[in-house]
Amino acid sequence: MDVLTSAADFKKSKVPQLQELDDLLRCHICKDFLKNPVLTPCGHTFCSLCIRGYLSNEPKCPLCLHELRESMLRSEYLVNEITETYKAARQRLLDELNSLETNQDNSVIEVVSDKEPSLLQIDDDVNENSNHITVNDTSDIIDEDNEIQITGTKRTARTILNGSRPTKAAKISDMFTTRKAKTEEKAPCPICSQLFPIRYLERTHLDECLTKPPTSSPPIKQSRLSPKPSESVSHVKRYLNSTNTSTQQRLPKLNFAKMTTSQLKQKLASLSLPVSGTRANMVARYNYYEMLWNSNFIDSINPVSESELRRQLMSWDASHNGNNNSSNGGTNTISQLMKMNSKNKGKEYEKLLKDFKKDSFDKKGWMLLHKNSFNRLLCDAKKTRRKTENETLMTSQSPRESSTQTELSAT
C-alpha cells in the first residue's frame, strides 16, 4: 500500500519553508504530487488525468473558474521532472532533518571532576582591581532528560591573590565538556580489503593481517568496495532531450447519440477493450480510456504501453462497473474474478484487491491465488483439444473404410 504523505510533514522541521514547496508540487484536485502536469491558459497546473476528468463534468478551471477546454491544455515537462526529482529525495530529506533535531536534543554536558566542585562564573561587571568572582549554588542542579539546568543565587567571594583569577577561569573552562556521538571513520585494509576503523587498522590490524596464514578463500577485490554507479534516471537529461515523438494519435471523443450499440462494440473491440456490460458501461469505459490514452501519449514525457493502459482501465472498470457487469450475466468479468476465493483467502484477497487498483499490482500473487482456476481451465482446454483431434481423425478415417468396403463388394 502506498504511503500517504502531506506537506505538513515539514511544518515542525528545521526548514518549515519546505512545506510550501511540497504543497506547490501537489495537484489541487487529487492533493497528490503532480503526475503528467499540464498548464492551463490561466496559468494553473494540474495532473493531466485529473483535469481531463474534471473538464468532462464542468468546462471551467477549478481555481479561477475561467472557461477551459481540453484542447487548451499544454504539457509541462519541466514541472514533471522537478516533481519526480523532489519525490525521489523527499523521504531522505525528511529523515536528515529529523536526525539533525534528534542529535541536537540528545547532546549531553558532562562534568569532569572526581568531586562535586563549585560552579564558578566570572563577574565582568565588577572592577578589575576587586577580583570578584561569582559562585553559583550547586544545590539547585536539576537533571531532566539528559539536560542539566543550573539555578541558584549568586554569591560574591574575594580572592586573596591577584594571580588566582586566570587560574580559576582555566579550571572553570575545564570543568565542562560537551560529549557528542562521533562515528569513527573506516578504511579498507590493503591486504584483506575489509573495513576497519583507521586507528585500529594502523596500530593493530595490519600486523595481524601480515602474520596470519592465508585462508582458502581469495581476497576480495577493491573494486567490490567501490560504490556502484547510480542507475536512477537523470531528470535533467530527460528534460533536455524531451520531445513529443509519440506516433500515437489523439483518441477522439465520440458522439454516442449517433452510434448504435453494435458500432460502439466495434469501436471498443478495435481498441482491444472489453465489450461486456450495458451500453452505459461501454460508454463510460470508452470515455475513461480516452482520458487515459490522451493523458499518457499526449502529455506524458515517459508514456507507458497500451497494455498498461488497459490494465489501468480494468482496475477502474472493476471498481465502477463491477455490479452492472455481473448483472449482465457475464462469467469472465474482472469483477467476478476479483470475488473468487474471497471467503477462503480473505486477507490475501483484500490485499490483492487494493493493489489491483494501483500501479503496484502483484501479478505473481494473483497467479498463486487463482492457480486452481488456471489449472482447471488448462485441463478443460486440453480435453477439448483431444476431443477435437479424435473427431477429426474419425472423420478422416470414415471415407477410407467406406471405399474399402465398396472394393470388397465389387470383387
UniProtKB/Swiss-Prot annotation:
Alphabetized UniProt keyword annotations: DNA damage, DNA repair, DNA-binding, Metal-binding, Nucleus, Transferase, Ubl conjugation pathway, Zinc, Zinc-finger
Instruction: List the GO molecular function terms.
Output: single-stranded DNA binding; single-stranded DNA helicase activity; ubiquitin protein ligase activity; zinc ion binding
Q: Does the keyword Hydrolase apply?
A: no
Q: Which InterPro entries match?
A: Rad18, Rad18_fungi, Rad18_UBZ4, SAP_dom, SAP_dom_sf, Znf_RING, Znf_RING/FYVE/PHD, Znf_RING_CS
Span list, region Disordered: 209-234, 385-411
Regions of compositional bias (Polar residues) in chain numbering? 218-233, 391-411
Annotated Zn(2+) binding lies at C189, C192, H205, C209
GO annotations under biological process?
A: error-free postreplication DNA repair; error-free translesion synthesis; error-prone translesion synthesis; protein monoubiquitination
Zinc fingers typed UBZ4-type, residue spans? 186-214
Q: By its UniProt entry, which SUPFAM superfamilies does this protein fall under? A: RING/U-box
What are its E.C. numbers? 2.3.2.27
- Complex and partners: Interacts with E2 UBC2, forming a complex with ubiquitin ligase activity.
Q: What name does this protein carry?
A: Postreplication repair E3 ubiquitin-protein ligase RAD18
Organism for this UniProt entry: Candida glabrata (strain ATCC 2001 / BCRC 20586 / JCM 3761 / NBRC 0622 / NRRL Y-65 / CBS 138)
